Structures are given as structure tokens and as C-alpha cells.
Amino acid sequence: MDQMMMGAMSKDMMSMPGMQAMDMSVMQACMDACSACEQACTVCSTQMMSCAPACMNCADMCNTMMRAMMRMQGMNPATMMSMLDACMAMCQMTMDECMEHADHSEVCKMCAQACKACMDACMAMKDMMMAMS
């Protein structure tokens, strides 16, 4: 998504009751990382059959996480924390699988890097949510 649309979306989300305390830059970074990881995993799944199932599952999880963050209003914080944990676990598994091929596959290397960035962003999101509670 382009910056103008994301800025407008963040502004709209900030107007929702209960969202004012949310650090939208952390949330936006997590959504961006999930989107990038979804794309990298989708590309990787078409290139390396040995890691295709992990990559496809990770892409789906990242997409689900990103979409859930877009509609956080009314989301149970414990559920969101569990989803972030699941996303990080899926990214870790996929990163580990892709690292086995990273020395001879640039696609797997990029996928592993995207998974790591997504894990880091999900952890930052969790930290921010815990600080709010």
C-alpha cells in the first residue's frame, strides 16, 4: 500500500474508541512486515518445492495477522497476543527451513530475511500491547 493510503488508514484507525493509546507506527511496521513476508513466502513457495508447504502456510498466517491488525477494534487482547505468537512461530519455522537452502537460493535467503523481520515486528507489536495493559 502506498504511504498516503496507509497514513489515511492510520488516521481512521486512531479515531476508533480505544485505539488512541496504540502506537500506530509500531502497528504499521508490523503490518508492513507481515505483508512483505507474505509476498516473499509466496514467491519462495513457487521456487523451492522442498519448502513450499512451510512458505505457503507462513504466507497465509502473515496475511491473516495483517488483516486482523486492520480491524483491531473489538479484538480481545489475549487473542491478538496468541495470533502474534502463532505468526512468530510460523515465521521461525519457515525461516529455519529456508535457511537450509539460502546458500544456493537467493529466493530462500530473501524469504528467511522477511520472516526474521516479521518476527521482530510481531515482537515489537506484542511489547507495545503489553505496555498498554
What are these regions (language model features)?
Residues 1-133:
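Amphipathic alpha-helical hairpins
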